[in-house]
Amino acid sequence: MSSWMASIPSPGPEWAQIHLPFLPFRIQTYALIILTGIVVAAMWTSRRLTKRGAEPGVVLDVLLWAVPLGIIGARLYHVVTHPADFFYPGANVWNPFQPGAIWNIWEGGNAIFGALIGGAVGVGIGCRWTGLRFWTFADALAPALLLAQAIGRLGNYVNQELFGLPTSLPWGLEIASGNKAIPVGLPEGTLFQPLFLYEIVWNVIGVFVILWLERRFRLQWGRVLAVYLIWYGLGRSYLESIRIDPSEFSFLGIPSNVWAAFAAVVLGAIILRVQAQRHTGLEPGPYLPGREWVSPQAEVESGETDPEEILHADDDEERTGTHKPQATSLSGSN
C-alpha cells in the first residue's frame, strides 16, 4: 500500500500476562488496564461530587458495592449471551479449577452492558447506604465512566478482541490466525476493522460532548446520565453491527449487544423526558433530606463555640477579676 500506514499490528501473546518472579501467579494485563480505568473514574467522580458538596471520599463507599456487582453482572451477561461458549457436551461449566468454567473471568468474557446493569444496582445500594441522591452520583459518574471505558478498550487490543469485518483500510487491524473469532475461509493476513480503536475515539469525544452539554444546559437530576446512555448506545449499536462475534446470541437476526445498545438509547431518552417534567429546577444538594453531610468548616462557621475559646475566656476572667453573673434558677433544682 502507498498509504502512510499499512496496518495496525496486534500485541503478541506475551503482552497478555505479566509475570513477576516473586508472585506464584501471572497478572492479566487486561485486568490491570480495567483497574486503571476504575481508579481514574473513581478519582474524577470523587472530585465532581465534592464540588457539589458531598463528603470527600464518599465515592469509595459507593464503589464498594458498584465494582463487585459490576464484575458479576459483566460475567453473567456474557455467559447468557454466549451460551455456546460454555454449554456444550463435555464442557467444564462449574469447576473453577479447570479451564472454561463460567466463574473464570480471568480467561476473558466480560460484557460492558452487564457491568452497567450490575454496577447500577451497586450504585443504588451504595447511595442508599451513604444517603447520596442516586441521580447526583450517576451524573457525577457519567463522563468519568465513559473515559474509563475508553481506557478499558486498550485491554481488548492486548487480548486481540473486539474487531470487526475484514477491511482494506490502511488502519486495518492484524489478528493472529489462530483467533477463534476469525471466520473460516479468510486468507492469511486478512485485516479487520479495529473496533476497539473506534470506540476509544467515540468515547473520548463523548466525554467532551457530555461536559459541554452539562455546562451549557446545567443538566442535573440524571440528565447527564441520560446523555451518556444515548451517546454510548448510538455508537455501540453501530460498532456491534459490524463486529465479528460468532458465538453471540441473536434475536430476529440482530445480535444481543445491538439490542442492548438500542435499549440504552431508549432508556436515556425516557430519563431525559421524565426528569425534565418532574424536576424543573436544580438539585438542592447531593444528599437526601435528613442525610446531609456537614463539613467541619461549615460547623465552625455556623456559630458553634470552640472549646478553646471558652478556656481562654475563663483565663481572662481570672486575670482581671471579673466574672459574669450566674443566672438564678427558678425551679430550685441543681
Swiss-Prot record:
The gene is lgt. One of its GO terms (cellular component) is plasma membrane. The lineage of its organism: Bacteria, Bacillati, Actinomycetota, Actinomycetes, Micrococcales. PANTHER family: PHOSPHATIDYLGLYCEROL--PROLIPOPROTEIN DIACYLGLYCERYL TRANSFERASE (PTHR30589:SF0), PROLIPOPROTEIN DIACYLGLYCERYL TRANSFERASE (PTHR30589). It comes from Leifsonia xyli subsp. xyli (strain CTCB07). The chain crosses the membrane at residues 22-42, 54-74, 105-125, 131-151, 191-211, 251-271. Pfam families: LGT. Its EC number is 2.5.1.145. Belongs to the Lgt family. Residues 301-318 have a biased composition (Acidic residues). It comes from the Bacteria. Catalyzes the transfer of the diacylglyceryl group from phosphatidylglycerol to the sulfhydryl group of the N-terminal cysteine of a prolipoprotein, the first step in the formation of mature lipoproteins. GO terms for biological process: lipoprotein biosynthetic process. Keywords: Cell membrane, Membrane, Transferase, Transmembrane, Transmembrane helix. Its main location: membrane. This is Phosphatidylglycerol--prolipoprotein diacylglyceryl transferase. It is found in: Cell membrane. Residues 296-334 are annotated as: Disordered. Residues 323-334 have a biased composition (Polar residues). It is a multi-pass membrane protein. The keyword Zinc does not apply. GO terms for molecular function: phosphatidylglycerol-prolipoprotein diacylglyceryl transferase activity. A 1,2-diacyl-sn-glycero-3-phospho-(1'-sn-glycerol) binds at R153. Pathway: Protein modification; lipoprotein biosynthesis (diacylglyceryl transfer).
